[in-house]
Design a protein with these regions (language model features):
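Conserved small/polar residues in nucleotide/adenosyl-binding loops
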Residues: 1-2
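Short, conserved secondary-structure transition motifs
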Residues: 12-24, 46-47
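Long, compositionally biased charged/polar accessory segments in the mid-to-C-terminal portions
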Residues: 30, 34-182
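Ligand-binding grooves and catalytic loops that recognize ribose/phosphate and carbohydrate rings
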Residues: 19-35
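Internal, well-ordered alpha-helical segments in soluble enzyme and binding-protein domains
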Residues: 8, 18-22, 77-80
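Short, acidic/small-residue loops that bind anionic groups at enzyme active sites
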Residues: 5-13
């Protein structure tokens, strides 16, 4: 059956921001500055500890810190993110993947400033899949204490400013909320 051919993998997730907000943000930049060549989010050129978004307009590149701040202050996430049924220790998948936060504290000799991935194996099928790919990876064995992070057991907490943010957005628009909250 299909279960023999498909692996079920879930992702450790902080949350997903509103696609409408991202689209309007890009449209606002383009309207004010000109055609966007590219717009990136969580760019790692300065390492994963200081992710920045960049926009390139008319050949000039610049960081965009306001949107990043809005993302990390948890105002712009989708409502379902705050009640995510998958952010739990009871995973029903073969494997969980995500960023290995705080690895520099728990396995310092393995820390990579561009990021380390975390694989949590839940089933024999997940273990079999990992055995197939681990030869292509540089791996270290860890334990749940070393790799624990908040979104492994609970959804992201809703910002106390979320309702105010969305009310401001609906009344005053994207530029206003980016200036006020970003």
């Amino acid at each position: 059956g299909i279960r023999d051919r498909v692996y079920i993998v879930d992702i450790i997730c902080h949350g997903s921001p509103s696609p409408k907000l991202w689209r309007e943000y890009a449209e606002s930049i383009q309207k004010k500055e000109g055609k966007i060549t590219y717009l990136t989010f969580k760019d790692k050129r300065n390492g994963w500890k200081s992710p920045t978004a960049y926009v390139k307009v008319n050949g000039a590149e610049r960081p965009i810190k306001d949107y990043v701040k809005v993302f990390y202050n948890r105002c712009a996430l989708r409502p379902s993110c705050y009640e995510c049924p998958y952010a739990t220790t009871e995973r029903k998948t073969d494997m969980t993947i995500g960023d290995f936060w705080h690895i520099e504290e728990t396995i310092p000799d393995f820390y990579d400033p561009n990021g380390n991935s975390l694989f949590l194996i839940h089933t024999n099928r997940g273990e079999g899949l990992f055995e197939k790919i681990q030869g292509d990876l540089d791996c270290r064995l860890s334990n749940t204490t070393q790799c624990w992070q908040a979104n492994l057991e609970a959804p992201t907490k809703k910002s106390e400013q979320r309702e105010e943010f969305w009310n401001d957005y609906q009344r005053k628009g994207i530029d206003f909320v980016m200036k006020k909250y970003g």
